Amino acid sequence: MASQISQLACFSSTNRQFHFQSRSFPCPMIRPQSFVVKSVDGNSSETPASLSYTAEVSKPVVEKTSKPYSTVDETATNKESITEPVEEDVATQPIRAAKIHDFCFGIPYGGLVVSGGLLGFAFSRNLTSLSTGVLYGGGLLALSTLSLKIWREGKSSFPYILGQAVLSAVVFWKNFTAYSMTKKLFPAGVFAVISACMLCFYSYVVLSGGNPPPKKLKPSATSPSY
């Protein structure tokens, strides 16, 4: 009888100790998490709240990863917009050339020299004036005509301009020498002045870079040769 009473006393003491430990150390695993979710979202279900929270957190990550690509595209477009005006400026740069073509005055000048030699021979019967007029005047006419032909083809007529400048210098020197010896204004004085003006004109065309290019080239000149 005494042993049964002692067993009951031991059982009651262990039961009290178990209840005391369960009261003093509660398990905080599930309830605080459900309480935090309910206090933030205000929903009764726990699973949708956690899913919405993870979706909201993932949005800034996507935005952050997409920003560097957008900045790279913006920098690329900015570089293209900067380089385009430079290319346009290079393409629209004007070509350095004279305002007037050499043959515009070269052909009339050559014809005037030839006619002056013929008139001088007709009045004075001087073979020197005839040879000078025909030789140098014919050379000026030939060079001016060739310069016009080459210019129409879109090629450079710079050598023909230099040739006309040399011939005009020779005609000027001969007529100036004849005028200084005879003191006759016509024809030596007049041709000396005209030749000096033409020499200045040819010098201007040469220093300016030659004749200006034609506005419309022929198809044969623009098409590449194979």
UniProtKB/Swiss-Prot annotation:
Keywords: Chloroplast, Membrane, Plastid, Plastid inner membrane, Transit peptide, Transmembrane, Transmembrane helix. Mediates the export of free fatty acid from the plastids. Potentially prefers palmitic acid (C16:0) over oleic acid (C18:1) and stearic acid (C18:0). Not involved in fatty acid activation. Required for biogenesis of the outer pollen cell wall, in particular for the assembly of exine and pollen coat and for the release of ketone wax components. It is a multi-pass membrane protein. Residues 1-39 form a transit peptide. It comes from the Eukaryota. One of its GO terms (biological process) is fatty acid transport. This is Protein FATTY ACID EXPORT 1, chloroplastic. Belongs to the TMEM14 family. Induction: Up-regulated upon induction of early leaf senescence. Residues 66-87 are annotated as: Disordered. Residues 67-80 have a biased composition (Polar residues). InterPro entries: TMEM14, TMEM14_sf. One of its GO terms (molecular function) is fatty acid transmembrane transporter activity. Disruption phenotype: Reduced biomass and male sterility. Reduced size, thinner inflorescence stalks and flowers producing short siliques containing almost no seeds. Small vascular bundles with reduced secondary cell walls and modified cuticular wax composition with strongly reduced content in C29-ketone wax components. The lineage of its organism: Eukaryota, Viridiplantae, Streptophyta, Embryophyta, Tracheophyta. Expressed in cotyledons, leaves, sepals and pollen.
